[in-house]
């Protein structure tokens, strides 16, 4: 049999998921959170970075930013001087005692003022016992090793670890920032896209760049063309156009037409959480009287709370439509 030709680096990159293919490797490539990234670039130029906790929602570049910092500080020594762990998989005390401690004890030749780096992703998933053990390890090996923790909520990190770290917070990316990156990637990949298609991806991403790129790739590979219709087929969320129509019917005090749309969404198998979350997002941007919109948002919030508490029947959503119609009647 003829030998398979050796794959070039470009061939390998073409088969990568786009979230890896377009992952930033320099600070200037990171989208959003400019002030926080600027603080980290100061650490990079000074060389002696402290222990760091970066807290923020998923898909905003927390781990990527830490990796960029490690690359600048360590250069060619990155592979042997960086330990990356996902704490949600390896959350027990044994990981700290074995993997992290052994890595901290290893001798690696680095330039003066540089340290080995332990990157802990989803650190808020670690058990309290593991965090206590980590605190001790951070203390003992502070002269040779720095720790960078990424988490969604810093409240779940124990106080002794928080007090040993510089706390940085990332916020959700704006729709404009996500859209700009999607356009850039679509041009690189030579995709056929419509404005509505990209806006649909931005709507489903909710400020999460990772989600946005995954949805873009899934739509491109599933259908080829990036249109709103194709995006919602892939992402399978309640269509915002239907929800917008439903809210307008409520604003016009027409509960029968509004309920028809709700019943259709329920029949399609969407969960109450999906329906209520998207009703809220659509209501925020819909063009209706401002005072009425505030009343609607209040009622949607109360129903959302009930659904999260577990009362997630069609009856709750139907009651919401009735309350929205009553609110509209008063205006």
Swiss-Prot record:
The elongation of primed DNA templates by DNA polymerase delta and epsilon requires the action of the accessory proteins proliferating cell nuclear antigen (PCNA) and activator 1. Subunit 2 binds ATP. GO terms for molecular function: ATP binding; ATP hydrolysis activity; DNA binding. ATP binds at residues 56-63. Heteropentamer of subunits of 140/145, 40, 38, 37, and 36.5 kDa that forms a complex with PCNA in the presence of ATP. It comes from Drosophila melanogaster (Fruit fly). Transmembrane segments: none annotated. It comes from the Eukaryota. Its main location: nucleus. Keywords: ATP-binding, Cell cycle, DNA replication, DNA-binding, Nucleotide-binding, Nucleus. CDD domains: AAA, HLD_clamp_RFC. Disruption phenotype: Defects in mitotic chromosome cohesion and condensation due to aberrant checkpoint control in response to DNA replication inhibition or damage to chromosomes; premature chromosome condensation and precocious sister chromatid separation figures. Belongs to the activator 1 small subunits family. One of its GO terms (cellular component) is DNA replication factor C complex. It is found in: Nucleus. The keyword Hydrolase does not apply. InterPro entries: AAA+_ATPase, ATPase_AAA_core, DNA_pol3_clamp-load_cplx_C, DNA_Rep/Repair_Clamp_Loader, P-loop_NTPase, Rep_factorC_C, RFC_lid. The keyword Isomerase does not apply. The lineage of its organism: Eukaryota, Metazoa, Ecdysozoa, Arthropoda, Hexapoda. One of its GO terms (biological process) is DNA repair. Coiled coil: none annotated. This is Replication factor C subunit 2. Pfam families: AAA (PF00004), Rep_fac_C (PF08542).
